[in-house]
Amino acid sequence: MRIGFDGKRAVQNFTGLGNYSRYVANILCHFYPENDYVLYAPKKRENKRMNLLTGQYRQLTLAYPATSFWKKLSSLWRVWGITSQLEKEGIELFHGLSNELPLNIHKSRIKSIVTIHDLIFLRYPQYYQSID
């Protein structure tokens, strides 16, 4: 199976959600090596922890926006443009690791799952903007 992940945090964050994202990738690669795992990130960033993982597991790769258009609009790519790239690259399951999925993924044949880390926004909505 080809499994894609929102890899923004895995690539760009060195603590918190970045650690969580790398941990999920590490565990899945270790216990389910028959699958291919692709972490999709809007931008490249030097990250030694991520480099160790991709060096350790041949089935784990990084992917970035495929066209110059989406490279320039990388934030929009994460919420809209990524879906067509996932389809072209044969992703069967997409995991949003940090509370969100692409807005149009439901229109594709790709199954999806999202991890919600915190529900405090439900208890105290006045402290959060609607975009969040």
Where is each model-derived feature located?
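Carbohydrate transferase catalytic cores enriched for Leloir-type hexosyltransferases
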Residues: 1-132
